[in-house]
């Protein structure tokens, strides 16, 4: 018994308990943070997307509340058969849970199952409309052609794209050419 008491007394000495001089602000307590996150997004029990990132930072007290996705983002979008129909990657994003919209930024790349590729520095996903939007320079690579523009509207699998202020080579099928006679 005396040995146990001495052991307990030694464990509670100067080396046993440490004091923290850190003061955590009230604002810091209102922010949730998670590392190495994978999120499955579903609707009516059907998986629609899988999102992976190194860091989530949630701020429910902001107006409007948001979730920052830092240090690289990768999303796979699925069709009803659970096949990947497109992927999205970027360095950062901000998710607004009130309307399920995303603001994706910095080195944004969207690739569909056909290999068509969209590159830009900023892209907005409007969940209600189920479309991507951008107002900054964009690059679209389809087959052997590259188109540039400032701004776009597109569906999530890039099967339909409207490029604003378009420039570059636009492929046209021979039967779509006007008669020159």
What kind of region is each of these model predictions?
Residues 1-181:
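Mature-chain termini and adjacent capping regions
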């Amino acid at each position: 018994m005396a040995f146990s008491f001495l052991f307990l007394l030694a464990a509670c000495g100067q080396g046993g308990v440490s004091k923290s001089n850190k003061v955590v602000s009230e604002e810091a307590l209102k922010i949730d943070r998670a590392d190495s996150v994978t999120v499955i997004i579903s609707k009516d029990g059907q998986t629609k997307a899988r999102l992976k990132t190194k860091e989530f930072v949630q701020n429910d007290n902001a107006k409007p509340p948001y979730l920052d996705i830092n240090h690289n983002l990768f999303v796979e979008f699925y069709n009803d058969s659970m096949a990947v129909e497109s992927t999205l990657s970027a360095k950062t994003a901000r998710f607004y849970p009130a309307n399920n919209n995303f603001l994706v930024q910095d080195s944004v790349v969207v690739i569909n199952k056909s290999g068509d590729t969209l590159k830009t520095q900023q892209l907005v996903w409007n969940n209600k409309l189920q479309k991507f939007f951008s107002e900054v320079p964009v690059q679209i690579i389809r087959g052997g052609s590259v188109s540039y523009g400032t701004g776009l509207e597109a569906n999530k699998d890039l099967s339909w794209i409207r490029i604003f202020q378009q420039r570059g080579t636009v492929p046209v099928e021979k039967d779509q050419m006007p008669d020159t006679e």
